[in-house]
Amino acid sequence: MADPGPDPESESESVFPREVGLFADSYSEKSQFCFCGHVLTITQNFGSRLGVAARVWDAALSLCNYFESQNVDFRGKKVIELGAGTGIVGILAALQGGDVTITDLPLALEQIQGNVQANVPAGGQAQVRALSWGIDHHVFPANYDLVLGADIVYLEPTFPLLLGTLQHLCRPHGTIYLASKMRKEHGTESFFQHLLPQHFQLELAQRDEDENVNIYRARHREPRPA
């Protein structure tokens, strides 16, 4: 009998460990947020099962605020959100006219799907799919106009996996928006200052001093002329 190989979900859990003690008590909480004229009702399912995927983090709110203040145009754009957690960023992109795929590890999909159903009208362009960076990203097309991520840069072993996933998903003239709490102890600054600029044209789009959140915009480097 042939060896079936490693189980993708088990492999992803070894790279993205659950922080069991983070939300030890299990409970759900609904919160409302207003962006771009939309009132979003987001359920956060706190508990050890979801860990960091349970809550709406500051970086996600900063990114939504940025999209509103900069009037970022999602209409007709093919969009994917990575490490979505609650799905708030991707949901806003869908409500703004994007054709959106919202992704995270399998354990977070039920929460995301519930939030999509609560906020995106029937017929809206928002689908929810599992994506484990560096493991199954190649089953997704390589033609996304916009790749979004909020507070997904905090585990150094995942940095090469995230980088490869970004390189695959973003089309040649597409744009990546990454919002991140700048945690020195998690290697976040190193990722944005050293690793990502090796492969993408990177610029700091906005800095939120109060929340210590940076929003970066990245694009593929133009090929050098022969």
From Swiss-Prot:
Subcellular location(s) of the protein: Cytoplasm; Cytoplasm, Cytoskeleton, Microtubule organizing center, Centrosome
Protein's organism: Homo sapiens
Role this protein plays: Protein-lysine methyltransferase that selectively mono-, di- and trimethylates 'Lys-165' of the translation elongation factors EEF1A1 and EEF1A2 in an aminoacyl-tRNA and GTP-dependent manner. EEF1A1 methylation by EEF1AKMT3 is dynamic as well as inducible by stress conditions, such as ER-stress, and plays a regulatory role on mRNA translation.
Oligomeric and partner information: Interacts with members of the heat shock protein 70 and 90 families and of the TCP-1 chaperonin family, as well as with HSPD1, STIP1 and tubulin; at least some of these proteins may be methylation substrates.
Residue intervals passing through the bilayer: none
Binding site for S-adenosyl-L-methionine: W57, G83, A84, G85, D104, W133, A150
GO biological process entries: peptidyl-lysine methylation
Molecular function, one GO term: heat shock protein binding
Pfam family for this entry, one: Methyltransf_16
Family: Belongs to the methyltransferase superfamily. METTL21 family.
Coiled coil (UniProt feature): none
Name this protein carries in UniProt: EEF1A lysine methyltransferase 3
